[in-house]
Amino acid sequence: MSEEQDPLLAGLGETSGDNHTQQSHEQQPEQPQETEEHHEEEPSRVDPEQEAHNKALNQFKRKLLEHRRYDDQLKQRRQNIRDLEKLYDKTENDIKALQSIGQLIGEVMKELSEEKYIVKASSGPRYIVGVRNSVDRSKLKKGVRVTLDITTLTIMRILPRETDPLVYNMTSFEQGEITFDGIGGLTEQIRELREVIELPLKNPEIFQRVGIKPPKGVLLYGPPGTGKTLLAKAVAATIGANFIFSPASGIVDKYIGESARIIREMFAYAKEHEPCIIFMDEVDAIGGRRFSEGTSADREIQRTLMELLTQMDGFDNLGQTKIIMATNRPDTLDPALLRPGRLDRKVEIPLPNEAGRLEIFKIHTAKVKKTGEFDFEAAVKMSDGFNGADIRNCATEAGFFAIRDDRDHINPDDLMKAVRKVAEVKKLEGTIEYQKL
């Protein structure tokens, strides 16, 4: 700490200056009136007592500054000691880890007493084992993974639940900044979806008060590009719950039983991290109708579907886990999957009407630089049969027309040319007739 920053030194300096000024005034003799005849200058006098006082004060300042410096050094040394202690502890733990032998992994089967448990080792045998004193007994429930000492088989620590890497990667889905305000033409569908998913998670007491059971899940079906996946993303971003994004095709595995195991792991992870939403896109990959004939691969898909049905039946009605499924082929789904009690609500996501297309045009061109008066009504009339993805593509194509003309904005003519171009491409697409489920 410098002398200017130290309030004590500053105070001492002010006191010294005041004393010196006072002594000077006290010692200054009365000046005689000067006359023209005689003027005599007296030599300045130095008070020995004042000189000793100033000397002692300066010495005290030096000692105080030295004390401050030593105090800062002491603090730095203590911080260094704490850092070295942390490094020492880490090194000790590393040495112990290198010198210690491995431990077995087991699963708690039953509690016999506070100190004795039946544990199933990973190799298969079951043992009655003790517990280390530092282990929390209240967490030793049935099915909990623990480590066992390789010699005494004592429970050493509790392990987290084993999660399949494939299931864990499903939880790292990027939700983005999608909101319901960015989805146009689906007001009624958004209301139905939020009633089934959001309302039971945020206000479950409403259903208890009325005396009804909230639905377990919802099926979104309709033509491609109408916003089914977008709705699920908006739900996840709005509620703030844990979200598992699982394309149904990614669940299918070539080894027998692996697909069903992934389904079990996924639902177990969801129950442990409630509130949680499971979104299965293109569910027709595993939810197709079952039939007696078929290859071994078809039978494996049917076993996966049966495991999915079993897990959905095991849900608590007022639990904090909800499921959303999406497909553009609802006619191929198995009736057992569609029955009430599993997917209680089916929401059709149709092609947008004129009002919906107008709203979608405004949403997708909101952030685009524009010049001139845009007549969206003309674009809406020309875009009959377009879905939301087609309208977004119109905004992109209009931007390309502006780039070709070396402009940094689009004009109404660019948008009309883009609509005509997308309409020409739409002729190549087939159509599927959808009926309400």
From Swiss-Prot:
N-acetylated by NAT1. One of its GO terms (molecular function) is proteasome-activating activity. The keyword Acetylation applies. Residues 20-32 have a biased composition (Low complexity). Keywords: Acetylation, ATP-binding, Nucleotide-binding, Proteasome. Pfam families: AAA (PF00004), AAA_lid_3 (PF17862), Prot_ATP_ID_OB_C (PF16450). GO terms for cellular component: nucleus; proteasome complex; proteasome regulatory particle, base subcomplex. InterPro entries: 26S_Proteasome_ATPase, AAA+_ATPase, AAA_lid_3, ATPase_AAA_core, ATPase_AAA_CS, NA-bd_OB-fold, P-loop_NTPase, Prot_ATP_ID_OB_2nd. The modification N-acetylserine is found at S2. Residues 35-51 have a biased composition (Basic and acidic residues). GO terms for biological process: ERAD pathway; nucleotide-excision repair; positive regulation of RNA polymerase II transcription preinitiation complex assembly; positive regulation of transcription elongation by RNA polymerase II; proteasome regulatory particle assembly; proteasome-mediated ubiquitin-dependent protein catabolic process. ATP binds at G222, P223, P224, G225, T226, G227, K228, T229. Residues 1-51 are annotated as: Disordered. PANTHER family: 26S PROTEASOME REGULATORY SUBUNIT. The 26S proteasome is involved in the ATP-dependent degradation of ubiquitinated proteins. The regulatory (or ATPase) complex confers ATP dependency and substrate specificity to the 26S complex. Belongs to the AAA ATPase family. This is 26S proteasome subunit RPT4. It comes from Saccharomyces cerevisiae (strain ATCC 204508 / S288c) (Baker's yeast). The gene is RPT4.
